[in-house]
């Protein structure tokens, strides 16, 4: 039998010991960046309302949000513009955002408080860790990944987020009938996304093999997108269904 605490955490049969936690290898570094005073205050005032502290135990997301609704995850939300826009325009969904860049988290916290949002929760942590240890398989209706770091030098391509193991992890967390939406303004990253996702069991490109879709109305144009367009880059929107 699964035991749930009041904050939606599924209590595991044997939690990690302190020594086990120390031995874990982190695949990321939390990025502090330059905090404005307002962003610092946002963490102090609004993290208890919107933030989720990583504890390494599976969560019941319906308990976490206090309702049963479709769950959307945005990985690497940056300054939070896309996530905030979606929360404003699609209130029937519950949103989970993950970001390692602290000033971006602070900026979004301020925006969510200004909007009076009730259906958004944020992690300031690594997406792989959160997905592996806190999200139940099949719990998500949609995953959104917009303009991940392209690591444009060829020798750095191995650092890109969209790799076979990560794609398999995303498939596990999506329910059948859910979808994965990604956007990039780097042509060779779009090619890599197609290579990886077309070869991942459980995903089917809604636009056909190596196809793309128009920008959906749920995605606002980000500053990264505008910057890319100013540099002459086009944007690829890839939409995959979980089957």
Swiss-Prot record:
The keyword Amino-acid biosynthesis does not apply. The keyword tRNA processing applies. S-adenosyl-L-methionine binds at residues 74, 99, 126, 149. SUPFAM superfamilies: S-adenosyl-L-methionine-dependent methyltransferases. The active site is at residue 149. Pathway: tRNA modification; N(7)-methylguanine-tRNA biosynthesis. This is tRNA (guanine-N(7)-)-methyltransferase. It comes from Xylella fastidiosa (strain Temecula1 / ATCC 700964). The lineage of its organism: Bacteria, Pseudomonadati, Pseudomonadota, Gammaproteobacteria, Lysobacterales.
């Amino acid at each position: 039998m699964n035991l749930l605490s009041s904050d939606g955490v599924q209590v595991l049969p044997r939690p990690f010991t302190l020594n086990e936690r120390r031995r874990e290898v982190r695949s990321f570094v939390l990025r502090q960046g330059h905090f404005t005073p307002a962003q610092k205050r946002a963490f102090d005032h609004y993290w208890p309302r919107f933030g989720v502290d990583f504890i390494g135990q599976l969560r019941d997301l319906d308990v976490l949000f206090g309702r049963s609704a479709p769950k959307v995850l945005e990985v690497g939300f940056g300054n939070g513009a896309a996530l905030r826009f979606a929360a404003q325009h699609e209130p029937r969904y519950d949103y989970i955002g993950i970001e390692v860049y602290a000033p971006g988290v602070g900026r979004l916290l301020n925006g969510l408080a200004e909007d009076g949002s009730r259906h958004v929760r944020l992690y300031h942590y690594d997406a792989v860790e959160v997905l592996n240890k806190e999200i139940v398989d099949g719990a998500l209706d949609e995953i959104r990944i917009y303009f991940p770091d392209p690591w444009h030098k060829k020798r750095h391509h191995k650092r890109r987020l969209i790799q076979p193991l990560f794609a398999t992890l995303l498939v596990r967390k999506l329910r059948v009938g859910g979808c994965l939406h990604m956007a990039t303004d780097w042509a060779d990253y779009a090619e890599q996304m197609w290579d990886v996702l077309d070869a991942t069991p459980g995903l089917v490109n809604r636009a056909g093999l190596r196809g793309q879709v128009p920008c959906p109305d749920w995605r606002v144009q980000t500053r990264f997108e505008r910057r890319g367009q100013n540099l002459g880059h086009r944007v690829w929107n890839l939409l995959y269904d979980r089957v």
